[in-house]
Regions:
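Acidic, proline/glycine-rich low-complexity intrinsically disordered segments
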Residues: 5-9, 16-17, 21-30, 34-74, ...
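Pre-signature/interface helix of ABC/ABC-like ATPase nucleotide-binding domains
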Residues: 27-29, 94, 557, 566
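The N-cap/first-turn positions of alpha helices
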Residues: 35-38, 79, 525
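Intrinsically disordered, low-complexity glycine/proline-rich and charged
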Residues: 73-75, 80-116
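Hydrophobic patch in the ABC ATPase nucleotide-binding domain
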Residues: 85, 192, 574
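Amphipathic alpha-helical protein-interaction segments enriched in hydrophobic
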Residues: 488-493, 521-533, 557-558
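Sterile Alpha Motif
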Residues: 526-551
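C-terminal non-catalytic interaction modules
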Residues: 543-584
């Protein structure tokens, strides 16, 4: 590459040779010509020694009368000041007595045509955005798959603590586990300008991890490293990978952020493996997955009672079971267990964003402490600004309070971080806000992109119904039921839709199915309320809502603006229930 056309990147800096411009984190620095010329010469021969005599010839012609020694020393001193470097403990430029100088930091050299394309390509994508693709399991034992997935998620979690980075969430990156698309296409789909990919090979007490960071627009390798370590070093490896990514993307980290990234979740490797396996079960997002995750999470805290992240995850699993209306035990017992686990997690670690986030969800979903929940969400997002789930749940709180613009802002931020798996929340809250046309457009898009996801067909069904396409809406709700035959949530919504369409016979048949199911297992009274509301039986519907309130079952916190209970809003008993929930 011609010297005069080069673009050099090192640490947070970028030097553009053609325009003679030096940038730090995207901000142009003022620099005199001589220090800039020296920096260009050193970067062009990164790692090599450039003698003082070579620099003299570069800066001053033989005919120029100047105190060369003083002039060069002054220029080097200015340069170190610009880079915040030290002669005694150099990070960028090393002095070799009687020999010269050399650059000791990794330098990336980019062709300007590629840089221009990258700039054009990423005009709407933040420069510091990264998606961590699932690490490939190269171990002989296929059961180590959960271990590789755990490393993927932990690196994402570390990066999500950095305010200056946009980090795509686990749920979205896991859809590309099979690598059936090119890196550039994956980056476009995820809205990320860079991708981290890697592999994990575990053998006995040793682990080999290979990681590389790639620019989606240019296919340039921004950073790569191989770690051959003892398994006990796994946490140090994860931290190092996260910090190296931050450096490569020129992300500025505060002291507190760096400290949080370096914190070990547990000193017990076996507890960590149990936790990782439980996390894999949790991410199935099914009743069985939540219940099985609890077994592994509890086994993890049995080994290490101080494992705060595992306690927060126990709280999360119980909470998801309660809100979904399928708890495997009484809602009261599950809620008590969730609260106890969340409280214990915070007692262990007050700076764990996940613990504040799940505590916030418990505060508003079960205690109706809206102000306390909002404070907890704000703290969670301060500690983990890249948490899609915290933004998502905060959006639920705002929507429950009728703050629809704020809710949509949070949910759209969540979707930026989790572009694959959070389309339906936006549709739901557009419907709650009465923005039917926008909701229908979003719903159709989500159903096209995720045809196998029941919730996508559920929200599409309601968007169609409110748009006047009743038959198409019911067909979409039937599709949701077919995709998730065990979920009473979708069945009960279908019952309401049938009742509203005048098919009372079918609505009552669905009501009977729910009754029959409730004889064998717990069915949330919240789901019965859907059907009764559709049938116009207001008192029966409110009876069920009051039972759901008493037992904190289902998504009772969202009833104020729910479009499924719109015909109950003027009922005195419904208004009384809202007052009991601090929603009047």
């Amino acid at each position: 590459m011609p010297f005069q056309d080069a673009i050099y990147r090192f640490g947070p800096f970028e030097l553009r040779a053609r325009t003679r411009e030096l940038y730090k984190n995207g901000v142009r620095l003022k620099v005199r010509p001589q220090p800039l010329q020296i920096l260009l010469a050193l970067l062009a021969r990164s790692g090599d020694i450039v003698s003082r005599e070579e620099l003299r010839r570069l800066l001053w012609s033989a005919e120029t009368f100047v105190d060369f020694e003083h002039g060069l020393n002054t220029a080097i001193k200015e340069l170190r000041g610009l880079l915040n470097d030290s002669a005694g403990e150099p990070r960028y430029i090393e002095t070799l007595p009687k020999l010269g100088y050399r650059v000791i930091v990794p330098v990336t050299q980019v062709a300007p045509v590629h840089a221009a394309k990258a700039k054009e390509k990423n005009a709407t994508t933040p420069a510091a955005s990264v998606a961590v693709l699932p690490f490939v399991n190269l171990s002989a034992a296929p059961e180590n798959e959960f271990f590789a997935d755990g490393i993927t998620e932990d690196v994402i979690t570390h990066l999500a603590k950095m305010k200056s980075l946009k980090v795509i969430s686990r749920t979205s990156v896991m859809t590309f586990k099979k690598r059936d698309r090119g890196l550039r296409e994956i980056g476009e789909r995820l809205g990320a300008s860079t991708l981290l990919e890697g592999s994990v090979r575990r053998a006995g007490s040793r682990v080999r991890i290979v990681a590389q960071l790639i620019d989606c627009a240019t296919d340039e390798h921004l950073w790569a490293e191989t770690y051959d370590r003892d398994l006990t070093d796994i946490f140090a490896i994860q931290t190092d990978v996260a910090l190296k990514i931050a450096t490569a993307l020129r992300a500025e980290l505060s002291h507190d952020e760096r400290s949080r990234v370096g914190r070990r979740p547990t000193d017990d490797l076996a507890a960590y493996e149990l936790y990782s396996r439980g996390r894999n079960w949790f991410h199935q997002y099914t009743e069985e997955g939540y219940l099985r995750s609890l077994l592994d999470y509890h086994a993890a805290v049995d080994r290490d009672p101080g494992f705060a992240l595992a306690w927060a995850s126990i709280a999360g699993a119980h909470t998801e079971l309660c809100i979904g209306g399928s708890v495997g035990k009484s809602p009261e017992e599950a809620i008590a267990l969730a609260k106890k686990a969340a409280t214990h997690a915070l007692e262990i670690d007050q700076e764990l964003g996940e613990a504040h986030s799940i505590s916030a969800l418990i505060q508003f979903a079960f205690d109706f402490d809206w102000a306390g929940a909002e404070r907890s969400f704000l703290r969670a997002l301060e500690l983990s600004p890249g948490s899609a789930q915290a933004h998502q749940h905060y959006g639920w709180l705002c929507s429950s309070l009728g703050r629809y613009d704020a809710a949509l802002g949070q949910l759209r931020r969540a979707r930026e971080l989790d572009p694959i798996l959070i389309p339906t929340d936006v549709v739901t809250h557009l419907l709650r806000a009465g923005r039917i046309g926008e909701a229908l457009e979003e719903a159709r898009k989500s159903a096209r992109e995720q045809p196998g996801t029941p919730r996508c067909h559920s929200v599409l069904g309601w968007a169609l119904i409110f748009s006047g396409e009743e038959a198409a809406g019911i067909a979409s709700l039937e599709r949701a039921v077919a995709l998730s035959p065990g979920a009473t949530l979708f069945l009960s919504q279908l019952g309401q839709a049938c009742a509203l369409a005048g098919d009372v016979k079918r609505a009552r048949e669905i009501l009977q199915q729910l009754c029959d199911r409730s004889m064998r297992e717990f069915v949330s009274p919240y789901h019965f309320a859907y059907v009764y509301a559709g049938l116009g039986e207001a008192d029966a519907a409110i009876d069920c809502l009051e039972q759901a309130f008493d037992r904190r079952s289902g998504a009772i916190y969202g009833i104020k603006g729910s479009f499924l209970f719109r015909n109950l809003r003027d009922h005195p008993r419904f208004k009384s229930l809202l007052r009991r929930m601090n929603l009047s």
